[in-house]
Every structure is written in C-alpha cells, then in structure tokens.
Amino acid sequence: SANSGLHLGYLIDQSGNARGAYLGSGFDLKTDSYGAVRAGQGLYVTTHPKQSNSQPLDVREAQQQLVNAEGLLEALSGVSEQHNAGTLKAGHDALKQFADATQSSVAGGASGGRTAGGGTGNANAFKGPVMLFGSPAGIALSTQQSTHVAADQHVNLVSGQSTHIASGKSLVASVKDKLSLFVQNAGMKLFAAKGKVEIQAQSDNLELTAQNAMRILSANERVEIAAKQEILVTCAGAYIRIANGNIEIHAPGKIDVKGSQHSFNGPAQMPYPLPGFNKSELPARYRFSE
C-alpha cells in the first residue's frame, strides 16, 4: 500500500487500535510512493474560503487580481512607450488571455428526471486546461535544491508594490533579442562595491543622453577617451576635432589659452589599443517555439 492514506475531519494519530495525539483538522492525503493530481479541463487550487454551496471554480478573487495586474501592465507599458523604452504589450496580452480563460460557463443537466429544478443551471468553468493558484495570504515555493520555471511563450512578474531579487552569489541573465529597463519616477542606480563595471555595445553605437548635466569623474586616477576615427567636442558652435592625426580648434568667439609655459615642438603620437569583439548566433535547436 506504500503507506498511503486519506485522513479527513478531526485528525488523530492512529496506530493500530490505539488513538494517539491530535494532529490537526481538515484532510491529509499522503503516500510514501508517487502521487499525481490530474484535471483534464482545468485545475484551481486556493485558500480563499467559500461556502459549502459555492461553485468549485468560483475564482472571482484570483481572477480579479489577474485583471488588476493586467491594468498595471497596460499602464506601465503605455508610459514606457511614451518615453521610447520597450513595450509590455506581449506580456499584457498573454496575461489577459489567461485571465479570460478562467471565465466560462457550463450548463448542468439532471438525468433521470428533475426534482424541483435540482441539477440544473449554470456554473463557472475554464475555457481551457489551465491551472490557477490563488491565496489571500501569500504563496511560497521552497526547496533545498533548484527551482525551475519554463514557458514556451511569456513569463509575467507583476507586483502592486515592489519586486525584490536577492542572490547569494551571482545574478546572470542572457537575452536573445532585447533588454529594456524603464523607471517612471525615482531614477536608476547601478553600483559595484568591488570590481569593474563594463558596458559594451559590441556591434553598434553606445549613446548616453541626459536632460541636464552629465558628469564623468575619476576619484583616484584618470579619464581616458579614445576613438579609432574621430573625437568631436562641441558647444555653442565652438568645437575641438581630433581626426586623422590632426587637431582642429575652432570657435565663433574668443579662444583663450593660458599657462606658465607653452611648448610647440615637432610631431609626436601615442598609439592606443582598441578592443575587438566576437560575433555569435543562438543555435536553432535551443530556441523555444515561436
């Protein structure tokens, strides 16, 4: 029997004919072998309390929370697009499709005659074999090994307050197409207490733009600026251009040069090594279905 059993109601330890300690109340389904729960048309697991005459798939609380998440996704997606950042439309559409799939209707029919209309009417159902988990007080997943989440389409994380991610070692993300981060109100920070911070655009441009001041500081050492073809510094029509081994200093107004000494000697140069970049492509056999 693999020590299998279903314990219902007022749970008491039962060893042979002896009644033992109180274990709790409700139900306890367990086995020392394997277990499976299957529902071919959909499954709802919840801790939302209901009356005994409520419909099994009365998912109003969980469904309303999904609808609220839809609204937040849609609002933030719209603001992000207004600022030329990425859109959340694909995730919003997937979430809406799932929420809609939890609302359908099936009609009951009584066999062998109807007694005072018993067995008739309509009840909520799912449009497809989806799984929905809902709780008014929190959901946790815990394991001493690894947790895996895989989806052929989209993964949505939506929180009404904050989303926190903490890693005891490394946080590593690899993205095939695009990474977009957008903040509406309170700014963005990227700090490293130790080690370098490296930002590379290995096959295109790198653009840094600010509405107001932009500062580049080195607290202890130096700032290096190097380019293979040209460096151009310009403001209000005046500019300094460094290109082809030449330096141009032009201005529509005054050029003021001051120093205790001025040295104008013959030509000199300082070669500066520039990095090279690799090219790669994701093999087709590792792509999820599109």
Regions found by a protein language model. Give the residues of each.
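Structural signature for extended repeat/solenoid scaffolds and their inter-repeat hinge/linker regions
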Residues: S1-A226, E230-T234, R241
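Long terminal segments
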Residues: A69, S203, N212, N220-E224, ...
